Amino acid sequence: MSLRVRQIDRREWLLAQTATECQRHGQEATLEYPTRQGMWVRLSDAEKRWSAWIQPGDWLEHVSPALAGAAVSAGAEHLVVPWLAATERPFELPVPHLSCRRLCVENPVPGSALPEGKLLHIMSDRGGLWFEYLPELPAVGGGRPKMLRWPLRFVIGSSDTQRSLLGRIGIGDVLLIRTSRAEVYCYAKKLGHFNRVEGGIIVETLDIQHIEEENNTTETAETLPGLNQLPVKLEFVLYRKNVTLAELEAMGQQQLLSLPTNAELNVEIMANGVLLGNGELVQMNDTLGVEIHEWLSESGNGE
């Protein structure tokens, strides 16, 4: 069964967005079909960011009611065009974010030449404007969503190994951390580094503007002889925490972040991004490692 997807015309959608904004400020703004009677003149800014249509007779009636009758005489619309072009501000645009400098005025055309579809009708101080195209509304900051959080993980190191090793790992084994590092990640992005101190950790560097993509690939210089030699990247996660943007910014100011009690007893062991087990952070001779307490291997060795 095919999906019934509602089609949205971007031009009309932008007009509708502006209409809603104008109505919020007490202006009359409606999307409607203009009459195709009489003559029309299209206006736009020099950058062609917006365009609108006016009826010369309507414009004259608001500028000079005494001259409005001239609009019905043959060729009177063509006299309005140079007048509009020569006037610095022929009207006040009812849409605040639009520019009216260097107005482009086209020659009059009959109503039959108007574009298909609805136009946005807004009254200005010089009569009605029928907008055909409008740019996007300026972005308005709605504040930070307070409920939005980002998952951080504090990684103490990693080791590169092969798939065949995973089948031989069991509870009580110690996985050595070959590459010691103290890095903060949000998803696959490295945010910075941290130091372990008494009572918690302190984030030393945190650069949200220039975050790095984590490299999860293990390079090999030769063709793999079999599936058991597929590369596996083990990652050891000391702690995870979901934070708000305000909390994330505070971390960059070297604020002490308290660790949960016995965090060193619950280090997560990730393999290619998948949780396989957890254990205790230990030091074997001069090398950090994790002694496995729980192991979720598919081999059946361990739990």
From Swiss-Prot:
Record-linked NCBIfam families: PRK08158.1, SpaO_YscQ
Recorded family membership: Belongs to the FliN/MopA/SpaO family.
Keyword line: Virulence
Protein name: Surface presentation of antigens protein SpaO
PANTHER family in the record: FLAGELLAR MOTOR SWITCH PROTEIN FLIM, SECRETION SYSTEM APPARATUS PROTEIN SSAQ
Organism this protein belongs to: Salmonella dublin
Annotated function: Involved in a secretory pathway responsible for the surface presentation of determinants needed for the entry of Salmonella species into mammalian cells.
InterPro entries named among the record's database cross-references: FliN-like_C (IPR001543), SpoA-like_sf (IPR036429), T3SS_OMP_SpaO (IPR003283), T3SS_SpaO/YscQ/SpaO (IPR013385)
Origin: domain of life: Bacteria
GO process terms (BP): bacterial-type flagellum-dependent swarming motility; positive chemotaxis; protein secretion by the type III secretion system
